[in-house]
């Protein structure tokens, strides 16, 4: 199957899989082929396959059952998605596209914040972390959002905070991210608070390289957790569609173990 660039790859793949389901190639009650096989047949990455499957889940065609596979539960779309207004592009973006964008942008924001952060910024970040720990759950916590926005505010540039808040809010409004998030357990989410501690420590030291690495690693951990939570058929070493190695990822060589 040759996928063109007129639409996002995961949308093209989802359309092909939906057509097969509707035509009875994959009947209701059966399972889709393993993600590995879909990836090889369609000549796309595993990330693209995962996003396409999430889209099919949201629209009601399939159900992903951990340890069991991808089950076809309907041969017609059950849920219609509305993507209107200024956020339409965000609403149709794949969850891993959004995560990659956040990783690239927020790691650089954290780096700059370390050069501009004030004592008051540090106090506010410490208070946010304290409040986060007092909650009985960290899933969709307001303190998670506040932490990321406060890091951006520490740049002393309000536009940075607006960008971060708008991107972060897609975790609530993007239907594909919400579906993906349902598969994550609360214990895994608690590790995000520990990641925030590492970012805060770097900001306290006013170490831009360490702050950039800590934010990058935080979102890298999130990506790995999301993959582990939603598939039994994933080998990151063979997936170079997104999060491929580039100069940003090599910060660990620059910091020489400062974190």
Curated annotation (Swiss-Prot):
Specify whether Ligase is a keyword of the entry. Answer: no
- Spell out the InterPro entries in the cross-references: GntR_C (IPR011711), TF_FadR/GntR_C (IPR008920), Tscrpt_reg_HTH_GntR (IPR000524), WH-like_DNA-bd_sf (IPR036388), WH_DNA-bd_sf (IPR036390)
> Which part of the chain engages DNA, per the record?
35-54
- Effects seen without this gene: Mutant shows constitutively high galacturonate uptake activity under inducing and non-inducing conditions.
Ordered alphabetically, the record's keywords are: Cytoplasm, DNA-binding, Repressor, Transcription, Transcription regulation
A GO cellular component annotated for this chain's UniProt record is: cytoplasm
Compartment(s) where it occurs, according to its Swiss-Prot or TrEMBL record? Cytoplasm
Question: Chief localization class?
Answer: cytoplasm
What GO molecular function annotations does the UniProt record carry, in alphabetical order? Answer: DNA binding; DNA-binding transcription factor activity
Q: Residue limits of the HTH gntR-type domain?
A: 7-75
Q: Function of this protein?
A: Major regulator of exuT transcription.
UniProt xrefs under NCBIfam families: PRK11523.1
UniProt name for this protein: Exu regulon transcriptional regulator
């Amino acid at each position: 199957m040759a996928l063109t660039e007129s639409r996002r790859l995961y949308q093209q793949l989802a359309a092909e899989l939906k057509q097969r389901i509707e035509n009875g190639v994959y009947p209701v009650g059966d399972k889709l082929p393993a993600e590995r096989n879909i990836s090889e047949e369609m000549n796309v990455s595993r990330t693209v396959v995962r996003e396409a499957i999430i889209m099919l889940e949201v629209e009601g065609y399939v159900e992903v059952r951990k340890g069991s596979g991808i089950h076809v539960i309907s041969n017609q779309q059950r849920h219609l998605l509305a993507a209107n207004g200024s956020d339409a592009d965000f609403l149709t973006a794949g969850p891993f596209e959004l995560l990659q964008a956040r990783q690239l942008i927020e790691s650089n924001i954290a780096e700059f914040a370390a050069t501009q952060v004030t004592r008051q910024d540090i106090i506010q970040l410490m208070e946010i972390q304290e409040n986060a720990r007092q909650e009985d759950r960290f899933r969709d916590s307001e303190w998670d959002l506040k932490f990321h926005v406060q890091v951006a505010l520490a740049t002393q540039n309000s536009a940075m905070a607006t960008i971060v808040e708008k991107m972060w809010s897609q975790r609530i409004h993007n239907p594909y991210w919400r579906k993906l998030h349902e598969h994550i357990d609360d214990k895994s989410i608690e590790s995000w608070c520990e990641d925030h501690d590492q970012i805060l420590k770097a900001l306290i030291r006013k170490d831009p390289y360490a702050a950039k690495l800590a934010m990058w690693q935080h979102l890298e951990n999130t990506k790995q957790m999301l993959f582990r939570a939603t598939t039994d058929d994933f080998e990151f070493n063979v997936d170079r569609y997104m999060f491929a190695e580039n100069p940003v990822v090599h910060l660990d060589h620059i910091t020489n173990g400062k974190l």
